[in-house]
Regions:
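N-terminal secretory signal peptides
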Residues: 1-12, 24-27
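N-terminal export leaders
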Residues: 14-21
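Domain-level recognition of soluble alpha/beta enzyme cores
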Residues: 41-148, 351-361
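Alpha/beta-hydrolase-fold serine-hydrolase catalytic core, especially in secreted/extracellular enzymes
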Residues: 48, 53, 334-335, 339-402
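Short substrate-entry loop that stabilizes the transition state in hydrolases
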Residues: 139-145, 150, 154-186, 302
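Alpha/beta-hydrolase active-site loop
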Residues: 197-242
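Short glycine-enriched nucleophile-adjacent loop
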Residues: 257-266
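The feature captures the conserved acid-bearing segment of alpha/beta-hydrolase catalytic domains
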Residues: 272-331
């Protein structure tokens, strides 16, 4: 397939944003060298563990990694002779979790590469643990689980919206997250690491879309009782046959948000989609007749003609919301993790706000827990609440854009 050039890239990598924030000005209150010294000093007596907020749903959460190979196509970056290889994770409502370890936010190898890319000292021990228990049995409800597929942003990784993912799983969804190899920090079972490509060919949103459609095939295989892991690693008890291929939604951040829209246009298996500040480039000029929600921050309809054009193409149920004070990284895990890391680094409040916006991180967490759940509950489970009806006193910062 042909890859979509990623330059000029609307999606911002963490490296660029972290560097810009840490070196905000020549006279910054905390120079990068001093910040690194503060980080090293803080970890000298033991690793500082960052934390993620717990999900609010009634179920414990389980997770399992999957090593996937799409033998139907060559890798668009590695080229002919190399099938497309992906790392994914399935998150789900679980049971019997008491003695099972919690999954890390990223594997140590991937986190080490991620921190090096950001310019931080290599201490993967600081990475947070998620709420999910590795390999826990699936909670049996007597019916199959609705499925969501998550696509990350450019230069990121499949765990970048873990708060949102584990929230949905705690409320009864199976969520499949995928690393888009060569535009992600990804570690394979044999220890091989891949990082975002620095030279062409770059992956574009359409390449992400092809990955997502392959993951949809994997979902159907799991639903039919087939283990898709190429290494044959055992799956959690009850996972085979637990997913409902007739109730599938998709969501993504930034480039992943654009890919979500493109996937829905290409594949009828996705019944509802959510874009988290996706730039909608390349311009989408095809109508979409299924439910779609847009959570804007930096890439608004007013600022981005491509987003405005996409909005006009939504012919089914649609909703556009934006939280006051939100920017591109507000709706993800960074809103929680960057303030914690900033405190360790000695960053100023202004430097932190340059990265995640001025919205209170605790409010950002509640927004990213509540609104995606309400959207998918409405369209995949037909559970109608009132959160999506209009402005809500519990969320005064969330504006509905007509």
């Amino acid at each position: 397939m042909t890859t979509t050039p990623a330059s000029p890239r609307t999606d911002l990598t963490r490296r660029r944003m972290l560097t810009a924030a840490l070196a905000a000005s020549v006279g910054a209150a905390v120079p990068i060298s001093a910040a690194r010294q503060a980080w090293a000093a803080s970890t000298a007596t033991g690793p500082v563990k960052l934390t993620l907020p717990a999900p609010t749903g009634p179920h414990p959460v389980g997770t399992v990694p999957l090593h996937l190979v799409d033998t139907s196509r060559p890798d668009p970056v590695a080229g002919p002779g190399h099938h497309r290889k992906l790392m994914a994770s399935v998150w789900y409502p679980a049971c019997k979790t008491k003695d099972l370890p919690r999954a890390p936010w990223m594997t140590q190898g991937a986190l080490r590469a991620f921190l090096a890319d950001a310019g931080f000292p290599l201490d993967p021990a600081l990475g947070p643990l998620t709420a999910a228990h590795v390999g826990a049995p699936v909670h049996q409800t007597g019916h199959r689980l609705p499925v969501l597929v998550y696509s990350h942003g450019a230069g990121s990784h499949r765990g970048d919206h873990t708060i949102m993912v584990q929230e949905l799983a705690s409320h009864g969804y199976a969520v499949v997250t995928v690393d888009h190899t060569y535009d992600a920090f990804s570690e394979f079972p044999d220890g091989r690491l891949t990082v975002p490509a620095e030279v062409p060919p770059f992956l574009g949103p359409r390449d992400f879309t092809t990955d997502i459609r392959f993951v949809l095939d994997v979902v159907e295989g799991l639903a039919a009782g087939h283990n898709p892991d190429v290494d044959g690693r055992p799956l959690p008890q009850g996972l085979l046959g637990a997913l409902d291929p007739q109730r599938i939604g998709a969501f993504g951040w930034s480039k992943g948000g654009t890919a979500t829209a493109l996937t829905m246009l290409a594949d009828q298996r996705v019944g509802a989609g959510l874009s988290i500040d996706g730039p909608m480039q390349p311009t989408i000029t095809t109508d979409l007749d299924r439910p779609f929600m847009v959570m804007n921050a930096s890439f608004t309809r007013a600022a981005m003609p491509d987003v405005a054009e996409f909005w006009t193409r939504l012919r089914g149920w649609r909703l556009n919301i934006r939280a006051d004070g939100a920017i591109h990284k507000t709706y993800g895990d960074d809103a929680t993790l960057i303030p914690q890391a900033g405190e360790i680094l000695g960053m100023t409040n202004q430097q932190i706000q340059d990265m995640i916006g001025i919205l209170d991180p605790a409010r950002a967490v509640r927004i990213q827990q509540a609104y995606p759940l309400a959207f998918f509950d409405l369209h995949l489970r037909h559970r109608r609440g009132h959160l999506l009806d209009g402005p809500n006193a519990a969320f005064p910062e969330v504006k509905f854009i007509p």
